[in-house]
């Protein structure tokens, strides 16, 4: 069965909670993490064993075709 693929926009505390939750579901995965900071995205990807990281949200969504995107950014 094909895994349900998420991407996460934002690499803060809420994103960490979401990545942990997804890791507990057998048929789901976080395919990519995006952040305004490429360095922060890369560190997040290493911490959670995520295959791809991006410093640009648009580039991430153009490169990765997820089933869903989790927006973990602030509202202001």
Where are these regions (language model features)?
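N-terminal Rossmann-like dinucleotide-binding module
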Residues: 1-48
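Beta-loop-alpha module in the N-terminal Rossmann-like domain of NAD(P)-dependent dehydrogenases
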Residues: 52-76
């Amino acid at each position: 069965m094909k895994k349900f693929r998420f991407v996460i926009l934002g690499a803060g505390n809420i994103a960490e909670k979401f990545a942990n939750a997804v890791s507990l579901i057998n048929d789901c995965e976080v395919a990519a993490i995006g952040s305004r900071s490429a360095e922060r995205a890369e560190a997040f990807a290493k911490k959670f064993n995520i295959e791809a990281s991006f410093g640009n949200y648009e580039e991430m969504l153009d490169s990765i075709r997820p089933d869903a995107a989790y927006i973990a950014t602030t509202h202001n």
